[in-house]
Structures are given as C-alpha cells and as structure tokens.
From Swiss-Prot:
This is Protein TIC 214. Residues 1603-1615, 1623-1635 have a biased composition (Basic and acidic residues). PANTHER family: PROTEIN TIC 214, PROTEIN TIC 214-RELATED. Belongs to the TIC214 family. Residues 265-299, 798-817, 1599-1647 are annotated as: Disordered. The chain crosses the membrane at residues 41-61, 81-103, 108-128, 147-167, 195-215, 238-258. It comes from Lemna minor (Common duckweed). Part of the Tic complex. Keywords: Chloroplast, Membrane, Plastid, Plastid inner membrane, Protein transport, Transmembrane, Transmembrane helix, Transport. One of its GO terms (cellular component) is chloroplast inner membrane.
Amino acid sequence: MEVKKSSYNNREVATQKKGRRFVMILKFFLLGNPLSLCMKIINSVVIVGLYYGFMTTFSIGPSYLFLLRAWLMEEGTEKQISATTGFIMGQLIIFISIYYAPLHLALGKPHTMTVLVLPYLLFNFFWNNNKNFLDYRSTTRNSIRNFNIQCIFLNNFIFQLFNHFILPSSTLARLVNIYMFRCNNKMLFVTSTFIGWLIGHIFFIKCVGLVLFWIRQNHSIQSNKYLLSELRNSLARIFSILLFITCVYYLGRMPLPIITKKLKETSETEESEENEEESDIEITSEPKEQDEEEGSTEENLYFGYEEKEDLYKINETNKIPVNGKEKTKDEFHFKETYYKDSPVYEDSYLDRYQEQELWELESKEDKNLFWFEKPLVTFLFDCKRWNRPFRYIKNDRFENAVRNEMSQYFFYTCPSDGKQRISFTYPPSLSTFSEMIERKISLYTTEKLSHEDNYWVYTNEQKKHTLSNELINRIKTLEKKTGSLVLDVLEKRIRLCNDENEKECLPKMYDPFLNGPYRGKITKLDSRSIRDDLITSTDAEESIEIVWINKIHGLLPIPNDSPKKEFEYQKNLFDGEFLSTNSGHSSTSIGEVPLEYPPSLNLKKLSLLAEEKRMDSEKQAKCLQLIFDVVTTDYNDQTIRNQNNKLIFPGIEEIRKEVPRWSYKLTDDLEEQEEENEEESMEDHEIRSRKAKRVVIYTDKEETTNAISNTSDSDQAEEVALIRYSQQSDFRRDLIKGSMRAQRRKTVIWEMFQANVHSPLFLDQIDKTFFLSFDISEMMNLVFRGWVGRESEFKISDSEEEETKEREKNKEKKEENERITISETWDSIIFAQAIRGSMLVTQSILRKYIVLPSLIIAKNVGRMLLFQFPEWYEDLKDWNREMHVKCTYNGVQLSETEFPKDWLTDGIQIKILFPFRLKPWRKSKVRPHHRDTMKKKGKKNNFCFLTVWGREAELPFGSPRKQPSFFQPIWKELNNKIRKLEKTFSLSLVLRVSKKTRKWFLKISKEKTRWVNKIVLVIKRIMKELEKINPIFLFGFGKVKVYESNENRKDSIISNKTTDESTIRIRSTNWTKHSLIEKKVKDLADRTTTIRNQIEQITKDKKKIVVTPGISISPNKTNCADKNSELQKPIWQIFKRKSTRLIRKFYYFLKYFIERIYSDILLCTINSLRTNAQLFLESTKKMINKFFYHDETNQEGIDQTNQNTIHFISTMQKSLSNISNKNSNISCDLSSLSQAYVFYTLSQVQVNNKYYLRSVFQYHGTHLFLKDRIKDYCGTRGLFDYKPKHKKVDKSGINEWKNWLKSHYQYNLSQTQWSRLVPQKWRNRVNQRCTIQKKDSIILDSYKKNQLIHYVKQNDYGIDSWTGQKEKLKKNYKYDLLAHKYMNYEDGGDSYIYASPLQVNRDPKIPYNFNTQKTQKPESFYALVGIDISDYLGEESSLYGEKNLDRKYFDCRILRFCFRKNIDIDIWTNMHIGTKINKNTKAGTQNYQKWDNKDIYPLTIHQKTKPSTSNKRKKLFDWMGMNKERLYRPISNLESWFFPEFGLLYDAYKLKPWIIPIQFLLLNIHRNTNLSPNNNINGNQKKDLNLRSNKKEYLELENQNQQEKKQKLSQRDLGSDTQQDTQKQKKKEDGEKNYTESTIKKRRKKKQFKSKKEAELDFFLKKYFLFQLRWDDSLNQRMINNIKVYCLLLRLINLKEIAISSIQRGEMRLDVMLIQKDLSLTELIKRGIFIIEPVRLSIKWDEEFFIYQTLGISLVNKSKQQSETDRRYIQKYLDENPFDKSISRHSTMLVSEDKNYYDLFVPENILSTRRRRELRILICFNSWKGNVVDVDRNFIFFNENDIRNCGQFLKKDKHFNTDPNKNKLMKLKLFLWPNYRLEDLACMNRYWFDTNNGSRFSMSRIQMYPQFRIY
C-alpha cells in the first residue's frame, strides 16, 4: 500500500510540474513576448497568402462583367452556378500557372493568345447582339449539356485566362507575383492565396446576391413592371456595350496588330554595312558559291522571356530545332568557318561539318512545312514594332537606336562565394546552353559536400598560396647568379596546337586559351596619307613602329559620335607583286588589319612598353595576302570604289558587348524637310514632332560657285526657311506613330493656351501653378511683418512704378494670349486660312485703290469749297508711300508683290508700312507739346497689320487700334479760338492777381532755399565722415549701395588703403535680427539718397523759376504767374512731406551711425590687436617647429596658420583697382573666407535652414579637412556626425581616385549651366585663387587675395530666401560651393582635381603633380589634365580614313606650354585676338613680388629664363584674366576646373577662333623639326559667320600672321639655341608664309569631296564643339525682328528709306546685326549670347596618359628633385621621331624605340596574364587575412606602417636598393600595378554587373589606387 501511495504521489507531482511548465510557457507566449508571437503569425506564409488573395478581390476586371451579367440576367440557379464555377476555375488556373511554369508559358504566349482572343471576342459580340445567331432562349431541359450553360461557363473561364498583354490586369492582382520572390514554401503560399481570393469572392457574391434580393423585394421597383421589364430587356445590350468598351480600352493599350503603322526599316545592304561597321562580333561567312547556293548567313537573335525579337533584319533561314524550340547557331557559341582547304580548321571542326548537312536539311524542311506561319505571325504580332511609347533617343551618327525596353535582368542560380545564389544578371544564353547540356550529359552528378562554403574558401586559399609560392620561387630563381635564362623564369603561354610536329597553332583570335588583347584587338591607322607613304616607301627606317594599344583601350567606352557621312573606309589594292617587292615594313603598318596574325608566325608576346618584333618579308607577305583574301571574300559585291579607284570597306571594331538595337532609324518632320533635297530623303517621317510649318522666306537664286570642284549650280536654288511652331501645347511629344499613347505619362493643362504641358508630378517645381497663382513672398511678408517692423515707413518710392510696370506687363500678356487664341483658331479650322487670306487681299486692294483715293478726293474737294488751297500733291505722295507688304503667318515680311509659299494653306498677313493718314490740313496749328507727342506716336506706329474687316492692328490678330479722327483737329482749333475770346475779357484781373502772387512766392522761396542748402551740406559732411571711418559703408552689409560722385569715390579709394582685411567682423549671432537690421539700413540709405536727389532737383527747379520770372511759356501769351502759383503748391507739399519723413527717420539713422562706429572702430582695434598677437605667437611657434622638427611636416602648424601673411601693399592695390573700375561687378572672392568664419556663420543659421546644409555638414570627408578647433566646436553642437579625431591622417595620397570618381558623376554641370540656374549677380562672379603663403613663394598678380569688401555683394538670404524651393536650391548650391572649396583639398597642396585654395607648409612640397630640380631649371613641364573639361575635349581614336592625323584640335591630354622669359600670355593672347591691352593692368607689380624659380607653383606654365636676366624684374602672368578691365569671362566651366593658362587661351580662341595645330599648341617637342612645305599648316584659320541664311555655313579659312607668330614662338622654344636673334626669326617667318584661301559653301552630298583643310575645320567644329546662341526672349525677339526686315530689304531695289525708318522706329536693331566683316565675338560672348562649349565625349585615353596620370596622383614625393624616371620618361617622349612627313597621333605615344630591360621590376610580369589576374582576385577574396591591402579599404583607419603593396616582395632584396636608378625605375614600375587593377575593375564592372555602357563605370565607388610610399 505504501508503494502504491508513493507512486501515486509521484504521478501527482509530475502532473503538477507539467501543469506549471505549461502555464510558464503560456505566460511566456502571452505575456512575455506577445509582439514576437504576433509578428510570427503575421509573417507566416498562410496569413500573407490569405491577405494577398483577399486583396485581389478588389481587382475589378472585365471578367466581372460576365459574372454580374449571369447573376442579373440569367434565370435559374444552374446558370449562376456555372458562371461562378467558371469564374473560380479560371482564377484557380491562373494561380496554378504561377507555380507551374509550362502552364504559365502557355498562357503567356503572345501569338496564341492573340489568335484566340480576337476571334472569341468577335464571336461573343455577335452572339449577344444577334438572337438569331444562336438560340439564346432558355430551355426547359435542366441538364448540364445545355449549350447556354456551357457558354456561360466558358465565358467566365476564358476571360480569367486572358493574358496581361491583351487585357492587362490591375496592380493588386500582381502583388501575388511580387511576394513569390520572398516566399520559400511557394505551394503553400499559392494555396493560401487562392483560399483568400475565394473567401473574398464569396463575400463579394453574397453582397451582390443581397443587392439583387433587395431589388426583387422592393415594392416600388416591383410595382413599376414596365420599368423592370425594360431594364431586363436592355441588360444584355448594356453588358455588350460595356464589354465592347472595356475591350477597346484594354486593346488600345496595345495597338491592334493589323491597323498599326509599319515603320520603314533599313534595307539589307545598309544593315549589313552598318552591322559590319558597328558589329561586336566577327563574322566569317562562306565563300560566294556556297552563299549563293544556300543563302545562309549568321543570325543574331535575342530570345526574351515572352517573345523572340530580331535585333537586325537578317534572313531567318538558318534555324536549328532543338527540343522543339528554334535556336540559332550563335546561341551555341560556335563560329561558322568554311576554310576547308586550310589544315588549321579541318580536324578541330570536323564534327561540326558532319552535322552541318543535317542542320541544313532540317532548316529547309522547316521552311517548307511552316512557310505560312512566319508571315502570319509577323503580320499579327510584329516584334519589331515600337509599341511602348518610349522616347526615340536620336543618334545622329551611324548607329541605330538602342532598345531600352528589353530588361537586362535574368534570374538564374550561380555559385557565388561558394554558395548557390540567385543572380539577376545571369546571361540568358548561358543558362539555356547549360540546360541543354544537362539534358544530354549529366555533368552535375557529383555529390555536394556538406561544408561547401568552407571547402570553397579553403580551395581559394590553396590556390592563392600556390600562386604566391610559384611567384616567389620564380623571383628567387632570378636572384641566383647561376646564369639561368630569363625565358625559363617567365611563365609560358599555353597555345592550342594542331600538330606537334609542325607546331602550327590556331589563330590567336580563335584560340580559347588566349584572352585579352589577342582575342579581338585591331590596330588602326587613321590617316590615309600616312598609310600611302608607308606602303609606297621602300626605306625600312621610315616605317612606323606601332605599339600595341593597352587593354584599357578595349575596356573604356568609345563613343561613335561622328556624323554618318564622315565614315568612309578606304583600302588600297594590293597584289602579290607589290607585297613581294616591298619587304621592309611591319605588318601593322596597314590600318584596316581586321584579323590577328596567322598561325605559322611565332610572335613573341608584347609587354606594355616593349617594341614589336618585325617579321621577315615572306611571312609578312603571307600575312597580308591572307588578310586581304579574307576581306575580299567578305565583300565581293558590296565594295564601293571612289575616285581614286580605292576600295571602301568597313573595318571590324574591337570586341565589346552587343546592345539590342532597333532595326530602323526614325526621322521627324524637320529632318524630313532638311533632307528632301538630298539623295537619301525619307518617304515619310515616323516621329510625331511638335506641330510646325516650314515657311520659306527667301530663295537664293544666285549662282553658287563651288570652290572645290569649280562647278556652278545655277539651277539649284537654296531656300531659307523659318520653322513656325504652333502656339499650342505639344501633345505629340515626339511619340512614334503606332505606339501606345495611353502608357505615356499623363499631362494636364490649366490655361487656355499653355506653351508646355506638364505632368502633375512636377507641379511643385513650377513657379505659379493653377491652384497657387499668388506669390509666396507676398504671403511671407504679411506673416513676418511684425518682425520687420512697419513696412510702410520703409516703402520705396519706386514701388508704384513697379506696380504700374507689372500691370502693363500683365495686360500685354493677356493681349498676347488673346492673339494666340485667335491665331490658333484660324489655323485649326479647315479652309479658314484660305477664306481669311482671300478676305485680306480683298481688303488690301479696296483700301489702297478705292477707299483711300475716294477720301483724298473728298477732302480736297471740301477744301476747295471752303476757299482753301487743295493738298493734292502731299496727299498723293503719302498715299503712294503706303506699302502693303505680304508677310507670312507669323509676320515675316516678304515683298509687295511676292506671296508666301502655300499661303492659302499656311496663312498670310498683310503689313502696311507708312499707313496713310487723312489730315484736314498739312501744317498743323497744334501746340508744341502736342506736336511732340504726335511725333513720338508717328515714330512708333508708322506700320500696322490689316485685319479681315479692313481695320488696322498694332500686331497680327491684335485688337483694332483707334484711328485718329479727321474732325478732331478742327474741333480743337474752334475751341481754342473760342477760349481766346473768353480770356481777353478776364485778362486785367489775372494780371493783378499774378503780381501779388509773384512777390509772395519770391519771399518764401528764398527762405526755403537757404534751409535746404544747409540740410544738404550737413548730410554731405556726415557721408564724408562715414566714408573716412569705413569705406565699407559704401556697400553696407552687402546690401547698401550708395551712389557717390566721382570725387567722393576717389576719397573712399584713398582712404581704403589703410583698411586691413581683418576688420570685417563676424556677423551677429541672431541671423534673423541681423538680416532685418540690414533691410532697415538698406531702405534707410535708399531713402536718404532719394531725398537728397529730390532736394537738389527742387533747388534747381526753384532757381530756374526765380531767375526767369517774366518769361512767358504759353503760345497764347499767358503770364507765367499762374503757372508758378500752380507749381508752388505741389513742390511745397512734396518737400514738406519728405523733410518730415527725414526728421522722423533721423533717429534710426543716428542709431545706425553709432552702431557702425562701434563695430568698425572698436572691433577693428580688437581684431588688429588679436591679429598681431596671433601672428607673433604663430611666428614664434614656426621658429620653434623649424628648429626642432626640420625634416617633418607639422600638420597642426599648417592648420592653425592664419592667412594674413600676404603683402598688404599688393593686396591694397588689387582692391583699389577693383573698386576704381566702374564697369566691373563686385566679385565674391569666396576663397578669402576663413574656415572659422564660414562654419561659425553656418552654425548660426536657424534650425529650419540646416536641413538644406545637410550635404555640407554630413559630408563624410568633412572631418578630414577641418581644423581641430572648428571640428570640435561644430561637433559639440550637432552640426557634424562627430567622430573621433584621427591623429595621423595620410597626406596627399588620401582617396584621390575615390574622390575623383565621386566628383565626376553624371550631374557634374558646367559653369554655363550653373550660370543659367543662379541669378545674374552670380554670372560674372570670379573664382579667384589664393597664393602660396611662403616668404619666397610665387605671388601671382591675379591671385592676390581681395578683401572681403567684395564679399558683401552676395545676395541676402534672410527672410527673402524662404520663398520657395528654387531659392533654397540656389542657396544650397552656394553653400556647397563654399564647403567644396574648403573641404575637397588636402593640406599638402593644390590638387589639380579640385581647383581649391592652397595651404603650403613651410617645407616646400610638391602639390601632387610635378617634380622639378632645385639646382637647374627643368627642361619642361608635363602637365596632366585629368579634370572635368577633359571629358569634353579629349582626343578620341578616329576610325575614318578620310581624316588625317594632323587634325588640329585641342588635345587636353598633353598640355605643355613653354614660354620664353618675357612672353606674357595675356599680351600674347591679346595680340592674337586684337583687343586692346590696358597698360594699367600691371601697375600693381612691385619689386618685392619676385618669382622663385627654385620653388614649385601649381600652375604649369614655366618661364625659360636666361641666366643673365635672373635679376631683372619679371612680368607676372595674368593667368585667368582676373583683371576687371577684361570684361569677358569664360562661358564654359574652365575658370573653376581647368588649368588657368589653358583657360585664357581658350577664352582667346572663343573670342576670335583660330585653329592651332596639335603640334604647336600642345606638343612642344624640344628638338628642331623641319616641316616639309607640303605638310606645313598654313595659317591661323579663322571663323567668319555670315548670317545670310540659317543653313549656310560661311567659313573662311584665311592665313593670318597670328598663327605664323605662334608657330615661330613655338619653334623658338623647340630650338636648342634659345637665344636666337629675333630679326632672323622674322625673316624666317616672312619666308615661310604661305597664304591659302578657300571657302566652304553650303552642305553638299555625301560623296562630294572637300579640300583637306575645309574638311578638317568643318569636322573639328562639328565634332568637338557646340556652337549655340543663347536665345533668350529679348534676343530672340530682336533677331526675329531683324530677320523680318531683312526679308523685305532683300527684295527691294531702293532700300535706303525702308532701312532707315526701320532703324529709327526700333524695328531693326543694330546691336544684333553682323556689321563688320571680320567679326570679333567679344561682345556676344561677354553678354553670354554666343556660347562655345566642348561637346561631351567619353574619352579613349592611351595607356601612357593613364600611367602618367596615375603616377602624378599615387606617388608622394617628399623631395623637390625631379626624378630620373620623369626625365627619362620625357626624354623618351622627345627622342621619338618615327617620321617627319606628317604629324601623327602616334608621335604622342610615350614609347621608346629602345629595348625595355626593366620589365621585370614588377614581379607579377613573370606570370602570364591569366594567372596574374587570378592571383589578384584571390588576394582580394582573402584580403582580410593577409597583409595586402584590399581595394575597397580606407587607409585613414589603418596604420601607415601596415600598408603594403606588391613591392613587399622586393623589399627584402638588397640588390634592388643598391642602384638608385634601378630603385627609381622600380618605383615607376610599381605604380603600373594600379593600371592593371583599373583594368580588372573595368572588367568586373562590365561583365560581372552586366552594364553595357561606360557611364556606370564611375558609379562603382571603389578606391582603386592605394597610396604608394617613397622610401
């Protein structure tokens, strides 16, 4: 019993424990963590599926129509149940298709659904509308076999299956597909989604049933049986209409396949040519016989997810059926080759040829079986149609438009980092290929390892160690002095050999073991003349050695941005005889070598700088013969012969990724009109451009003589036409005909006639929207009026004037809109223009020949009846002067007799010049002031436009103006006579009163004059005192601008000399209060000036009145006393009111005066004491630092150095010259601001404004460049993301490439574009630089610091800046500019990447770029341009045989300008431009401003000085043209980003363009070059624009002395003897002058040849520069007015009168006329009207540029010596002289002809290219474990000592450190490592991330270049 009891007790205890445990678990779930429980439930697949399924219930589609129709109409539950069942079954099939791929593909096939849906809809429509079509009546049979029930089921079932391409579903239904990517258990998710959808639809059906039940039970509805029966009878018709409308709406989103417009595709010949020109694959086709027999060509098809689309129009004959699908051969990655005779191809491709016959038979069978299928499918569903309404991005070059609708995303699993991951950029062809292989061969039969990830990492580690050990062993082998051959150390390249005995290998381009440059590299020469010289020459020494282009060539994108007509490829005819006789040339002498070397040639692999081995003559002949055999078989029937009987054929470009393109080129209306006279005119335009009409205004019928071919085209007249655009909004929006407009972004308009339609998305960016038509600033003024004070007191008197102007402007705008409305109404109605034109012509004839002669006769007859002389002669003369000029619809004058072209359809205007005015008499007796007003009216209104009703209007379609009445002068004259008679009676009374009034007035006026003079004297004295105290009062806080006389201004200038720049106080902390005080002071100062001017004017007027009291001013002899008494009253009232206001505001004036005295005197004293103390402390600190730390750079010392160590005399002089120049705007020298001032001011901005400074405060690089004190101050206040300070910051090697990549993103706008965004005040702002602050540093005259007196010109951003987003954007831009100039540079110097101010330590360091020697003057500087403008002007490889290598354009890669000691660049450019030189510009040059030739300055123009002239005073360069006397500024972004010396040359070029040869401007090689006369570039070719027509380019190429001078200057520098006599030089110049004149006429056909220079200039201007006139509204109107007058003047014989009258009335403006023959564009450029901007290009740099560029950045050289490496590098540059006959681009390649013996200093070169890349990638994978630095790593957070690079292998070897030359060479080779790394990055970016353009290359924010230490 006890045992049982105990067991019972134990069981009870266990039960209690379980219960307690369950309660604890329940408590944990319910109380402890309810949130996680809820999240788990919500995130479960079932709940999410139910939610998405329920949401799809609300996706109401057309399928609901059938369901509702069945429930409403059909009687009987069977039909309702069948409808519901079909509805649910269809949806179930849709959900299952999400999971089951074959079903999804079957439902998504566009062809099948197109064929099925359209007949079904047609059948259903007829069935519902025709009762006799089928028996629709209900039957008594209750069976499922009832046909009606089956049809109802099918209707609901099929409508659910309609795919989205025919009837797109709503967005909610697609949420299911979106979640599929997140969910793992897809089947459970699909099931729960369907259940959710079922629940929702059951709920919906129940709701519908309740509504129907309510309708049936409603007594009011049931009582009206007639209404119910009618509703029931019409329900079928209603649902049919609804269904039809729905289908039409959905089908409208994709156009009907039958109706849509077929676009004209390019022909096969064009396509094949273009494919060969741009092809990214190399096509080797059959010989001609096989091609004719079988007609097979390679296809290039893209298989998308939903449809197959041809990228190019190629014959679809060679399909390969694989598993029921048509696959092309190209998808198998095979190459078809038919060289069956060659032993190379027989064995390797034997299997291919055996299968070829089967493929051809099957393709023929396919063609016979399905001959009807292709046309039908293509007809119904054209894959090439432009269905989506994409914008057609025009490509003016030779390529087709890129298809951007095809997604590059393709999801597939691939191993990544050892794991199987989904890749969204997997190549589709590769996945298809792998699936095909898997079906046939089970490749993946190996078992998966359990630890796959670890295995992968371990494998990579092993590979890395193996490669590293192999590399180290090879290096150790080299170290052994056992005589081991270097070739044994080098890794051999593996080749695919065909026969071991014969040692014949595959060609390199077909060898799968070779990659990189050998797989697709083609070397081209651009100049036909060079190639001809090479081929015809027999001297082997004159042949050119061409070095392989680096791999970077193939990786960086090459823009094809030359016009199509410039591409003509030429090939010389070769025969075997020629090749056998000329044996001294290398194989790469011919430019169009499209293939690699043949297999029999054993060529050594070339390294980066090694020269190419020459082949012997036999092998060379074989190579060339093979090449040209291949070429001729490619193009047997497509070769085109030019005049020289040379074959023109396209070369094959380098391999790059193929981009899907459209198979046609589209043109718009304008292009069609431009090309209508040319050979290749399009039939019809396909792009719906803006509605426009081409109005011919002038036809040039003169004989145009062609200067080139000396043939005259007298019969071909050139038309000058204007394009008249419709004033309506452009709803066409460049849509392509046949595309779906409904899918374009919706646009709305809210005005009657709106110029541009906008999407509602951009309403907030528009100034005044339709619902917010008031100005926000007015509202802000009302809100903040309490802060400002009573604004009425400070109201400026000009406000009324401004309001009046605003009212007039609004009135004019309203009238203009009314005119536009009338104009568009006439233009839109059919036949309205013909009716209106006929009425106008009729009214013109009636007016001229009937109405006006009748009025003249009537008037003169009346005069004769009134016994007055008739005025026949005067009236008939005026009548004859009236001209009725026929104008175009928008008012361009033609002539009196010539009607516009197509005037009955396009419209006409009739303009009346000198309209006739019928006057009662000629010599009017009107009073003089009336006569003046009439004169003004006559000047303004001596023309009008005729209206339809015969009236006159000021403007076309304007309101008729009021005609001067004929009888009004008569009534006026009668009234005057009557008034005279009345005045004679009251004359005596008037005289008596006037005497008394005169006495009283004289007495009062004397007293007032005395009092006013005293006030004026007091005010003047106060102003002078203020000016003596502080001249900044002239400008106030940046707003007050008191206009002084010249004397006062001179006084202020003199007193300004004593002002120190440190007297500018920091603004007060209260931003708002301070801005309000400024506003008050500004208003007060304006009021003071206005009052003073008014008082002076009153005094002058009163003096006049007092001095001449007795003069009568009335023609009626009225006494002056009446007038004086009337004038006295308003003058006295005005003066009293103004003086009272002055007295009232005197308190504020006094308060401001005291405040200024306090701020200027006290703060000046305090600041000066503080500055002096600080300077003393800093100098002491410097001396201590110099004594103790002589060899180290002191970071803190640099940062804390105040920038007040500039020579005050030169600073004052610069500021004086700026102030004294009245024409200059006050510049904002932002570079003068200190960091403390900038960030203290920014910190005082209110909190609501700090949001817009986030880009400044949260810039991740900010803390690196700030001083510690400022950093701590701003960090504690939360301005920055405060981070711990890094004590040791890497100096000038920090992230240059990273920052450079960041700064050059796509929105890097030019200065011109910024100037269009910011106000006018900022357009002329000059970004001035600071000087290098050293006692022996260079002080440039134009870089001296201006005082902050110019900073006060900035806009006020107080309250007024809170008025809208645009103002905030401008403000943000300015703050960014401030922050940019102070953050994006480093303390070591001025990086050329950022044009930032310099701070140089006491130890003279090289600021990144250049190395010079202290002891001797360097030979030259090699300036590198790696900045923004180089993206626009860089040299691009020319592919065109017609262009020459001596093409003259700016090559920004090599900018080396070597001047003699006394050549001033400013004087030189002015000498070339022809502008005057202001001699006072250089007045500020003092003796203490000396050049330090030992020091380095960041500007790279170097003066070559003679030793004997070292003590002479040297001229200072005006680098950027900062002197205010030169008013023009660079329009593009040169002043802030470019090298200053090149900027000035560029400005000079823009003012008076000349063409500088590349040899002289950019490549001053230091040797004597004697150019042959044939290749001498003759002259400075200058541009002369003749604006006679808008098409004609009238470019004269004249020889000018300037170019000869330029050449000679350069040749002086080229000569070894720099002290040549100038007289000899002049004689030499005169002897070498060679004048050539040629003229370019209008554009000719494609095949017409131009002369060499004309073609070069034309090509240069078109390709590299963008010429445009800034057509703002004012200039546009003036130019159009001038054109209108020109059109009339061209047709007149005697045009003097019309021209003078047009100028007098302001209709023709002289300022926009081309008056002088030799046009200097200074004025147009200065005003910003004419703009020359470089075309944005992607540059294909050469490898030497990249190498030197990288070296300039990566190497941190701590000495001032120029390394041996640099000298040798430049010497190689100078020694290279491959030929002298022409100037080749290859002369700029820095490749030595000597053997390269130091290739192995980079140990990686021992390995092959593939192994090298593999090693790098493995190192990057495992970089966290080793010492090698990763490419992504930021070096700031690591210790400097841990930084290692590939030099770590060589540090241990003492042999390398013994020879200093070799050590330097090693350093040079070490920096080649980043070059390879950049190449790898480009490869990874392009092929791993699937980008097909190079613009995204800058998006990869990877620091590619680590810092390289110099030990």
